[in-house]
Amino acid sequence: MDNGTTVISMLENDLYKFSMSYYYQRTTPEGIGTFSFTDRNGQKFTQEFVDLLKSEFRKLSTLALTEEEFRWCHDNIYFIPQCYFEWLMGFRFNPDIIQISLDDEGHLHIEATDLIYKVTLYEIPILSTVSEVYYRTYEKTEPDWAFIDSQLEKKVALSNENKLKFANFGMRRRYSHEVEDHVTEYLTRHAKYFIGSSTVYFAMKYQSIRPDLKPIGTMAHELMMATAAFMGPKEANYYVMRHWAEIYGGNMGTMLPDCFTTRVFLRNFSLDMAKLYDGVRHDSGDPFEFGDKIIAKYESYHIDPMTKSIVFSDALDFDRALAIQKYFEGRIKVSFGIGTNLTNDVGTVKPLNIVMKLKTFQVNPRQHVYRCVKLSDTPGKELGDPDEVHSYKVILGLI
C-alpha cells in the first residue's frame, strides 16, 4: 500500500462498473449522469474530514491501467471487448468533477457529474475512500487482526462444511484496502467455495494462487434508473435486458429485478429473457419470498428452476446465507455475494451505511435532464425526489 492511499489501481473497482461503462458507450454515448452520495445514518463530519477526502480524491488522478493489467483484462474479462480496455488505458479520474461540501448540520454531500460511461467509474472509489478516511480520522483504531482471522476461520468453516458458494462484494464499505487484501488472501487460501471477488484488482492479484478465482458481477440499479429516466419505468427492465443481451451475448447473465420492485420486474420478465438469462440477483426485500416468486415464474414458463440461479447479496452474513441455501436446496441454484460482513468485520468499529446512486440522467446534451428514481422491495430504501417516487408508483400501478 502506497503512503496510505485508499485506492491503488484502476482495477480497484467493481467488475460491473466496467461492464456498465461499456454498455453506456454502446447505448447512450452522449449520456450525462450525476451520482449523489447518501449517508443513511446521518453521520456528522468536519471540514478537516472534507479536506482529507479532497486530498485522497486528488490521488485518484494518478491511477492508470498498466500494460500488465490490460493483458489480464483481455484474457479474463473476455466478454468486454479489447477496444474498451484500450480506451480505459487512456482514462484518468478527474477530481475536479467531485463536488464535496458540508451542510449547516455537518452532513456530507458529494456529487460527481460527467459523461455517464466515465462517471459510473467514480462511485466505488468514492465510497471506499469515504469509509477508509472516516476510520482513520474518527475511530483512529487499528484492525484487530486476531479477531478478523478468528471470524474468517468460522465463516470459512461454515462455507466449507456446507458447500456454500460465495464471492466478496465488499469494496464499497470496507474498513480499508489493507483489510480487503488480507481477507481476500485468507479466503483464497482456505475457503474451498470462495468463487471470486467483485473487486477486479484482487481477483487478478490472487488468481496466481487460485487460477479458478474470477472477477464477479453483472449490473447495478443505475442501468434501469437511467433508462427509466428517459423512456419511463414501465418497460425499462425489458429494455435493459434486451440491450444487455445484445451487447454481451449471454455472458454476464444475471439480472437485477428490484429497481422498481420485483412485482414490476416479473411483468417484464418475458419467456425469451427468462430462457436467455442465467438467473437473477436478490438485493432487497424478503429473500425467501423473492426466491419463491422467481421459481414460480420459471415454472409458469415450464423452465426447470434447477437450470437457473439466484445470487443473494442483500446485507448478508454467513448464517443468513446458510439459512437461505437450506431453504432453496433442490429447488434452484444459489450463490452469495457477501460484502461488509467480510471486509469490515474488524472487531473495533461499526460499518458506515453509505451509498452513491444516480441522481439525474440526460440522454444527450440537447435533451432534458431527468431525475432518477430507485424503488425497492424494502420499504425505506427508495431513492429519488419524493414527487418523482410517487409518480413512478402511480405509473407502475403500485399505489
Tell me the role of every PLM-derived stretch.
Residues 1-236, 240, 245-246, 357-399:
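Ordered alpha/beta subdomains of enzyme catalytic regions
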Residues 2, 206-399:
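Glycine-rich phosphate/ribose-binding loops and adjacent secondary-structure elements
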